[in-house]
Amino acid sequence: MAVYFVTGKLGSGKTLVSVGKIQDKIVAGCKIATNLDLRLQNLPQVGRFAKTPRVLRIPDKPSISDLLAIGRGNDSYDENKNGLLVLDECGTWFNTRSWNDKERQPIIDWFLHARKLGWDIIFLVQDLSIVDKQARSALAEHVVYCRRLDRITLPFVGTLYSLVTGSKMPLPKLHVGVVKYGDSQLSPTVERWLYTGKNLYNAYDTKQAFSSNYDSGVYSYLTPYLSHGRYFKPLNLGQKMKLTKIYLKKFSRVLCLAIGFASAFTYSYITQPKPEVKKVVSQTYDFDKFTIDSSQRLNLSYRYVFKDSKGKLINSDDLQKQGYSITYIDLCTVSIKKGNSNEIVKCN
């Protein structure tokens, strides 16, 4: 079983990375229980047509009866199939006063024995220091420190950008959760959770307020198919054209830039002069009247200069380019072959 304390300042992405882990567990077919208000149909990897997610909504501050009601998270011995329990605003549960509260003791005991019930747990707190030391020692197997990369200023480049534009250099909204094995920042890093903000913002209520007077008990979310998918109607041609116009208007600048680059590349490719290919014209020769005018030997290679009946000199390299095969016999005798023709040429 894995227990995570996810920490970070306000807006650092604690809930977002936790919803990302919920999505991963749903895709793996695992059971989920949480006090977060989720919109399952907006999870990118789940979608509105999913029929199998098993997600339970528990009260904002669950009692022991609520935790007992969610049952087992995994009936097998394979811990990769463990269910995931995600609880936000846990700072009020694990401070020194609450840790020794007799009414909260059964809940704490349940957390200590959650492994036997097949549950992985994610606790969300703003800072680990507000958690009682005994609770940290007993439960904080992993501690996750959340950071938002768009709030970080790049050295030199960010300063130069601010001087030129007068504003902070925009960076992608990437949320990073650094997972430490232990409750110290010096503990070894075991993994990093990386999630982009935009595709998960609509999957949960970012303005959810937690209350001790939550009036509903434990209930199960409807699957996305039952709540949204079965009511989906395919778009007709007019609606598709309307969406096309909207997206073309939205991405018109990028599209025009891409078309400009493509047009310039195509024009340069078409108008580029093609290299001239030298064609070697094969001629026929009367090798009966050829004689070897000179010969040259360099290591294992030979070169000959032939003379025809008119006194014209032709070297062996030109003949080979025209497809003739020249076989050395001796410095004064060669065999010239092409196709079925084979002639012996000697010195004069």
Swiss-Prot record:
Lineage, opening ranks: Viruses, Monodnaviria, Loebvirae, Hofneiviricota, Faserviricetes
Gene name as annotated: I
Name used for this protein in its record: Gene 1 protein
Keyword Zinc among UniProt keywords: no
Mode of membrane association: Single-pass membrane protein
Keyword Membrane: yes
GO CC annotation: host cell membrane; membrane
Membrane-spanning residues: 253-273
Similarity-based family: Belongs to the inovirus G1P protein family.
GO molecular function list: ATP binding
Job description of the protein: Isoform G1P plays an essential role in phage assembly. It is required to increase the number of adhesion zones between the inner and outer membranes of the host cell. The extrusion of neo-synthesized phages occurs at these adhesion sites. May be involved with G4P in creating zone through which the phage assembled and extruded. Isoform G11P is also involved in phage assembly, probably playing a structural role in the formation of the phage assembly site.
GO BP term, pick one: viral extrusion
